[in-house]
Amino acid sequence: MPAVKKTNRRAQILQALAGMLETSPGQRITTAKLAEKVGVSEAALYRHFPSKARMFEGLIEFIEETLFTRINKIVNEEKDSLTRCQLILHLILGFAEKNPGITRILNGDALMGEQDRLRARIAKLFERLETQLKQVLRERKLREGKTLSADEAIIANMMICYTDGRINGFIRSGFTRKPTEQFNEQWAAFKQMFV
């Protein structure tokens, strides 16, 4: 039974951290403030996570697991390459919209002043997303016999830049300008540029 409680406490700590990232933009989150929010001592936090960096890594693991599990599902279920790209971009933007605090980790804002390895891990996450899009576009040529108006690496990079821009706009607006706002219209413009 204690293992269940530990898992729940870990999840509670991560949820509190994500909540504080959402409600306290621009402010550094200390372990003292986090412990107060969770209702435990700082020592109790450290029983579950050896450092604040590990807490952020826990949230990054959540991001990676959520996004890539769903991306794999999209790739396995959807056969049309452009539809796959559309669904992947919408997934990323929808995830950001539903998790505003975690979105500050995605753009690196919440990681300022934290360990370099955290920012490197987020950079790697975006590289993996771009590689996934590039692979989907490459398969369009191979499986569907259809070409694109530009190299798939350029198109994949533009899609990631678009996604990154929408995430940053969401943060700049104080989480009021939703990343998925006008997505379908913007996707239609993307399709015209690339097909």
Curated annotation (Swiss-Prot):
Residues 30-49 bind DNA. The keyword DNA-binding applies. One of its GO terms (biological process) is cell division. Residues 109-141 form a coiled coil. It comes from the Bacteria. Its main location: cytoplasm. Keywords: Cell cycle, Cell division, Coiled coil, Cytoplasm, DNA-binding. GO terms for cellular component: bacterial nucleoid; cytoplasm. NCBIfam families: PRK09480.1. Homodimer. Interacts with FtsZ. Belongs to the nucleoid occlusion factor SlmA family. Required for nucleoid occlusion (NO) phenomenon, which prevents Z-ring formation and cell division over the nucleoid. Acts as a DNA-associated cell division inhibitor that binds simultaneously chromosomal DNA and FtsZ, and disrupts the assembly of FtsZ polymers. SlmA-DNA-binding sequences (SBS) are dispersed on non-Ter regions of the chromosome, preventing FtsZ polymerization at these regions. This is Nucleoid occlusion factor SlmA.
